[in-house]
Regions:
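Long, contiguous N-terminal structural blocks used for assembly/anchoring
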Residues: 2-90
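Amphipathic protein-protein interaction modules
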Residues: 74-141
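Long, highly charged low-complexity segments enriched in Glu/Asp and Lys/Arg with interspersed Ser/Thr
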Residues: 140-148
Length: 148
């Protein structure tokens, strides 16, 4: 399992982590969702400098994600997986890579489903991921991570 996914599984003592643990216990934080969250923290910056700052993963973890944002991330991942179950299965990507690609594709990064060499399946997954709209993370005044 990638190190970033393992990092997200570590236990922390706060409300967001408590929610994450509860969701995982209910089977909602699967490898797709954990990889999606890991990718979000990896490729979103904290805006701590004029040039964008550091990737969130350097100073923040799933424990810092506001509960409402974490719920939305989980719901988005669950809905995407349900709506695209056949395509995801046909892609052969595996849950972790697919979760990673879902974040990248929906946010129009330079990589994603379309460059996985899976032909029409990649194109269709790209279309559905893009139709979910972008989700940008930011640090609130309370030092929690929020999504817009």
């Amino acid at each position: 399992m990638p190190e970033a996914v393992q990092e997200l599984r570590r236990t922390h003592e706060d409300e967001a982590q408590g929610l994450a643990v509860a969701l995982e216990a209910m089977g909602k934080l699967d490898d797709f969702t954990l990889a999606y969250i890991a990718c979000a923290l990896w490729c979103s910056n904290d805006d701590s400098t004029p040039s964008g700052g550091d990737p969130l993963e350097r100073k923040y973890s799933i424990a810092d994600i506001a509960p409402e944002t974490l719920r939305k991330m989980v719901n988005d991942c669950t809905a995407f997986q349900r709506a695209n179950e056949a395509l995801l299965g046909a892609s052969g990507l595996g849950a972790e890579l697919a979760g990673h690609d879902f974040w990248l594709t929906r946010n129009r990064h330079g990589s994603g489903f379309w460059d996985e060499d899976i032909g029409d399946v990649g194109r269709k997954l790209s279309e559905t991921a893009s139709s979910c709209g972008e989700c940008n993370l930011y640090i609130g005044d309370d030092r929690r991570i929020y999504g817009i």
